[in-house]
Amino acid sequence: MADLAKIVEDLSALTVLEAAELSKLLEEKWGVSAAAAVAVAAPGGAGAAAPAAEEKDEFDVILTGDGGNKINVIKEVRAITGLGLGEAKALVEGAPKAVKEGASKAEAEELKKKLEAAGATVELK
């Protein structure tokens, strides 16, 4: 145990350049590459993030365009949001804009269907 403590002390005293040189020497001696270990570890981290994305339960309904049916889309936006005519018109003309934020998946899908039926292009985020 005393030998390990001495090694830790010696390694802690190394400068960055000395540590880099030590790393190269160990890679040559053991026939390994430190970069390969990092590359192998990266996919595991990405895989862990994927299930969290699948479990998303709140969505933003984003109006990306009026599809040439501005009047129908404005009417639908007013019905969904309760905005006045001028505010709904500004929202549609300012696309891409959020029509509804934090909606449940079912509500977001329903709003998307209604807006697309009016001629709008919509995406869920």
From Swiss-Prot:
InterPro entries xref list: Ribosomal_bL12, Ribosomal_bL12_C, Ribosomal_bL12_C/ClpS-like, Ribosomal_bL12_oligo, Ribosomal_bL12_oligo_N_sf
A GO cellular component entry from the record: cytosolic large ribosomal subunit
Coiled coil location: none
Gene3D superfamilies for the chain: 3.30.1390.10, Single helix bin
Top-level taxonomic group: Bacteria
Keyword tags: Ribonucleoprotein, Ribosomal protein
UniProt-recorded name of the protein: Large ribosomal subunit protein bL12
UniProt-listed HAMAP family: Ribosomal_bL12 (MF_00368)
One GO-annotated biological process of the protein: translation
Function as written in the Swiss-Prot or TrEMBL entry: Forms part of the ribosomal stalk which helps the ribosome interact with GTP-bound translation factors. Is thus essential for accurate translation.
Quaternary context: Homodimer. Part of the ribosomal stalk of the 50S ribosomal subunit. Forms a multimeric L10(L12)X complex, where L10 forms an elongated spine to which 2 to 4 L12 dimers bind in a sequential fashion. Binds GTP-bound translation factors.
Organism classification: Bacteria, Pseudomonadati, Pseudomonadota, Alphaproteobacteria, Sphingomonadales
Species of the source: Sphingopyxis alaskensis (strain DSM 13593 / LMG 18877 / RB2256)
Family: Belongs to the bacterial ribosomal protein bL12 family.
Gene Ontology molecular function: any one: structural constituent of ribosome
